A protein has these predicted regions:
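Short S/T/G/P-rich N-terminal loop/turn motif that feeds into the first structured element of a domain
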Residues: 1-205
Length: 205
């Protein structure tokens, strides 16, 4: 049972927060954590953790508390915390292992089930070609949160050159015409649309 927690954290001391978190993860040999730094607000981080069981999550949380991890970050606040599950991935379990950048798009959605089905079709059509261009795709849906009807598309991007193209021109430039038809069908299902773009601080794996 794979699930995850995604946290958005605004740090008072970004470098200290990154260093303390990285050192803590290294000390405990954690391979299941990704950290990205916003390219527009460099004091904002996305912190994603992947778990294979609830017991793993509880064990790691206890390690965090015992080390006073949050207290040692130098101050800041969590802007959002969500429990999520991956439902579509072109590189299951490895998408965040080697990317240099991460683009995340999504928000509240009027029909999460249909969006998941459409995203699966898009991956069937274009998933491999995007992988060949250095872009892995993950879709996540919320398990908890307010609101809960949210789903996000993550694009894990291998190189700065590709990241620049995605940032400026959008991911649609990398899709085929058949894939774009489904993308255009899916986009209106999001009732709120948010996008974040992050530079990798720490990869999973």
């Amino acid at each position: 049972m794979t699930f995850g927690i995604v946290r958005l954290y605004r740090a008072s001391d970004p470098q200290k927060a990154a260093d303390v978190t990285n050192n803590h993860l290294d000390k405990h040999n954690r391979k299941n954590a990704y950290i990205g730094k916003s390219i527009t607000r460099p004091n904002v981080f996305i912190l994603a953790s992947r778990y294979e069981s609830l017991s793993q999550k509880l064990e790691e949380e206890e390690e965090n508390r015992n080390a006073n991890l949050v207290g040692n970050l130098g101050g800041g606040e969590f802007l959002n915390i969500s429990l999520i599950k991956p439902v579509n991935s072109t590189n299951p379990g490895k998408a965040l292992n080697s990317n240099s950048y991460l683009s995340v798009f999504g928000g509240e959605n009027s029909n999460v089930k249909k969006t998941v089905e459409l995203a699966e079709k898009i991956n069937e059509i274009d998933g491999q070609s995007l992988l060949d261009k250095g872009i892995a795709t993950i879709q996540t849906v919320a398990i908890t949160g307010i609101p809960m009807n949210t789903t996000f598309i993550w694009h894990a991007i291998e190189t700065p050159e590709t990241a620049e193209k995605v940032l400026v021109d959008g991911i649609t430039e990398f899709h085929s015409e058949d894939g774009l038809k489904i993308v255009r069908e899916a986009i209106p299902l999001w009732t709120t649309k948010n996008r974040g773009f992050f530079q990798t601080v720490r990869n999973m794996g």
